Amino acid sequence: MSSKGPSYRIENIVATVNLGVELDLESLAERLPMAEYNPDQFPGLILRLTKPRISALIFRTGKMVCTGAKNEEDLKNAVRALVKLLNDHGAEVPFDPEVQIQNIVASGNLHAEVDLEQAVFMLENAMYEPEQFPGLIYRMSSPRVVILIFGSGKIVCTGAKSEKDVATAVQKLYNQLKELGVLYIEEGGGEEEEEEEEM
């Protein structure tokens, strides 16, 4: 039997940043040609970076929401770049703002089929209603994440607060399903290659 094990890829990190100062969004919108600002429709200024590819919603209060990062390093680099950009255009933001990850979404592959009908009875805090949704919804308590598990072995993990949480949750899920006997590992493993993170 193949023991390829699980793999995953981070799809999105959502983080909040406290810039520590109030901002004049009108002035910044005039000075930043790439900024989107339409206060009648949305109270925040939108900035999009291309490297790393991240969107930021910036509010007058100095709160900022960043989405799109694929890893924590990209997130840190983006926040630094955004702070520099704001400061270069008239803001006075401290260079080391408080960054808090709110949610990490990752897709993954257990490289094995899962018997969802059996798994729902064996996992605590699991829900499976195939007539409403094809995946089993599993609320893991530690780390505190929600994992969608599909019969094909594909998974989606949400709610993690760090990359380490994702790695721990995916490996823990794999081990649990294997121990419960509801994981059918095929010889040779799948052809699809995903970026496998170290666990």
Curated annotation (Swiss-Prot):
Biological processes annotated in GO: DNA-templated transcription initiation
CDD domains: TBP_archaea
Keyword Ribonucleoprotein: no
Annotated coiled-coil segments of the chain: none
UniProt KW keywords: DNA-binding, Repeat, Transcription, Transcription regulation
Keyword Cytoplasm part of the UniProt annotation: no
Gene3D superfamilies hit by this protein: TATA-Binding Protein (3.30.310.10)
GO molecular function terms attached to this record: DNA binding; DNA-binding transcription factor activity
Sequence repeat ranges, renumbered to this chain: 10-86, 101-177
Function: General factor that plays a role in the activation of archaeal genes transcribed by RNA polymerase. Binds specifically to the TATA box promoter element which lies close to the position of transcription initiation.
Family affiliation: Belongs to the TBP family.
This protein's name: TATA-box-binding protein
Upper taxonomic lineage: Archaea, Thermoproteota, Thermoprotei, Thermoproteales, Thermoproteaceae
